[in-house]
Regions:
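HDAC/HDAC-like amidohydrolase catalytic core signature
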Residues: 1-125
Length: 125
């Protein structure tokens, strides 16, 4: 479906999977299952979001924190708060999740509805 100002969108980031240990408490697989169920009833509304830009991240995050996350130099205590082991995939997933929120907000402003299926997996510091 071509995007237009009046088209609601549903943004999914389940394609950006974190490499987690088998015993990790985070249920990563639920996002793919959710997208599959949404696709069955509204697949034409699904979209993969762009990654949040550095400028967008700077609106909600301390630049030193963003740089430390990107470089993989966060202290162990900060990584424990995040709850995920550092990896390039964690950076991409986080940027896509934040980008999905931005995109869903823009969709809601334009069409009255925008949904981020990955909401809740990103936490600002």
């Amino acid at each position: 479906m071509p995007e237009s100002a009046s088209t609601a969108r549903i943004f999914s980031t389940d394609h950006f999977v974190l490499p987690l240990p088998p015993d990790h408490r985070f249920p990563m697989a639920k996002y793919a299952r959710l997208r599959e169920r949404v696709a069955a009833v509204a697949g034409d509304l699904l979209a993969v979001p762009e990654a949040a830009t550095p400028a967008q991240l700077a609106l909600a995050h301390d630049p030193a924190y963003v740089n430390a996350v990107k470089a993989g130099t966060l202290p162990d205590a900060a990584l424990r708060r995040i709850g995920f082991p550092w990896s390039p995939a964690m950076i991409e997933r986080s940027r896509r999740s934040a980008g999905a929120t931005v995109a869903a907000c823009r969709s809601a402003l334009a069409s009255g509805c925008g949904i981020n299926l990955a909401g809740g997996t990103h936490h600002a510091h």
